[in-house]
Amino acid sequence: MLTVKFKHLDLKPGQRVLDLGCGEGRHVHGFHMVDGINVVGVDIDEPSLAKAREGIEYLDGQNPDTSPTGDTSFMQASAYELPFEDDCFDVVICSEVLEHLDNYPAAILEMRRVLKPGGILGITVPHGWPERMCWRLAPPPGGYPFEPGGHIRIFDDTALKYELVNAGFTFQRKHHAHGLHSPYWWLKCALWDQRDTHWLIKLYHNFLVWDLMKKPILTRFLDAITSPIMGKSVALYFEANEK
């Protein structure tokens, strides 16, 4: 399940891509299948990186006769202090990460530092009003916002856009994603004490997995019409200015 749309990243063979906060590697796995792309997945959590590496091994095992021509690697590092030289990536993405960080402006500055002038940045965060609904349905103490490693803020995407412009980027476009996922999270939050056991939540989860694997026309249509209204995520794309 990809939140960043690769068609907006202007990918070209030989480019170097950074996925900051790659988690278990869903976007890295996508980049891995694009010929000629050299991608580095960075995350602070080593168990997530281990799963991301396993995913690459699985993909290569499924496609033994079509080895990607690019290079894929992973590295454990902090978003506040990336172990890379200035201007060394052509594309940087950071998907569903900033809402977890205490000092997200520092991470934005690091992304600007390592991204080449003219390079593309793709940022995704939870969409404001669906996220607020989650916070209200499972309020503190102990609710949705207070999950270990959970979301510590709700972004206004317009305000975030201007923060990135002030950090040295030119805004290009935005879109929303995962309209069918918001009801699932609302249901989990409404039944917070049973979020891992309730039959209805399990049923909806199975539906989302089925949709992800089968991609039927009906649910693709439903996602297309619901995402602009109640998409779980909003994606913003920028070009890095000259320094």
Residue ranges and their predicted role:
Residues 45-47:
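Conserved SAM/SAH-binding beta-strand->alpha-helix loop
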Residues 38-43:
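Conserved SAM-binding motif I beta-strand of class I
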Residues 1-15, 30:
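Conserved alpha-helix/loop element of class I SAM-dependent methyltransferases that forms part
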Residues 15-23:
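Conserved class I S-adenosyl-L-methionine
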Residues 1, 26, 51, 55-69, ...:
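S-adenosyl-L-methionine-dependent methyltransferase catalytic module, highlighting the catalytic core
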Residues 24-36:
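Conserved SAM-binding loop of SAM-dependent methyltransferases across substrates and taxa
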Residues 80-91:
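A short acidic, Gly/Pro-enriched loop at the edge of an enzyme's catalytic core
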Residues 94-97:
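A short beta-strand submotif of the Rossmann-like class I SAM-dependent methyltransferase core
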